[in-house]
Regions:
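Tryptophan-anchored aromatic micro-motifs
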Residues: 1, 99-107
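Flexible, surface-exposed loop regions and adjacent strand-edge segments
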Residues: 69, 116-122
Length: 260
């Protein structure tokens, strides 16, 4: 008790066939959330518009309201603009159109699970001389939405040594997932086990497994590693270890001076 959780300011207009919330600004200790909502009846259907904008919201304090023991923290950015036209409230999601952009910069999140997946199997299992902590730098997800179907434009996770790129679709209308995630070591290594993973099925019972052809491609990469890896060392794409600049560019944002 006694802690200020935040404040909210909003402008509300209600009529018989129209509802406008523009703007609604929620000021929290970690940042601000801006929401705009508009629905209007155009017989026989309704038009719906929703915009959500969050810039650099520190979410650690919010999580601790629900779980005081959590040490999770970080910064989240959201820029979402969605529209729908439907004659039934239950079908609004089926007709969604718009964009969803999300970027998360977590703190103190280890990336060992990514290293085992996508870096070097042998050296990941051996004791390491270098005990420098590896971390998850950021997560970026950008989707275009059409008729309730979210299609990925730019989706990836960046850690100290690994980038995981993802593509696919999220079918909101039918509540189905069809995603493919493929890891890439920032510095190619011999005996890489960067096998693509597929996530498919309904929201409440999806399956995670090796993508079709994943094992075959892994075996081919192992076989050609003696040539491929040295070549990548010489000519491969370079990614900064901290990943911050990579994530900002993926969102088409100007890179902050402190991140350069």
């Amino acid at each position: 008790g006694g802690n200020l959780l935040g404040e909210m300011q909003f402008s509300l207009h209600m009529d018989g066939d129209e509802f406008i919330l523009d703007p609604a600004t929620i000021s929290l200790p970690g940042g601000n959330v801006s929401v705009k909502y508009h629905s209007v009846e155009k017989n026989p259907y309704w038009d719906y518009n929703l915009d959500i904008y969050i810039e650099r919201l520190e979410y650690g304090g919010i999580l601790r309201l629900f779980d005081p023991e959590t040490t999770a923290s970080g910064v989240i950015h959201v820029d979402t603009s969605l529209q729908s036209r439907s004659d039934n409230v239950e079908d609004v999601v089926d007709h969604l159109e718009g964009t969803v952009d999300l970027a998360v910069f977590p703190e103190d999140v280890g990336a060992q699970f990514l290293d085992l997946w996508a870096s070097n199997l042998v050296f990941a299992l051996l004791p390491k001389v270098d005990s420098k902590q590896k971390k998850l730098n950021c997560m970026v997800a950008r989707f275009e939405v059409e008729n309730g179907l979210m299609k990925s434009k730019e989706t990836f996770l960046d850690s100290t040594e690994i980038i995981v790129r993802a593509r696919g679709e999220i079918d909101l209308a039918n509540r189905q997932l069809d995603l493919l995630a493929a890891p890439q070591a920032k510095m190619e290594k011999f005996l890489s086990v960067s096998t693509p993973i597929a996530v498919t099925g309904p929201f409440d019972d999806f399956t995670v497994g090796v993508a079709r052809g994943g094992f075959v491609m892994t075996m081919i990469r192992w076989y050609y590693g003696l040539i491929y890896v040295p070549w990548k060392w010489l000519t491969g794409e370079r990614f900064p270890p901290d990943g911050i600049e990579t994530c900002y560019r993926a969102m088409d944002w100007d890179v902050p001076t402190e991140a350069r």
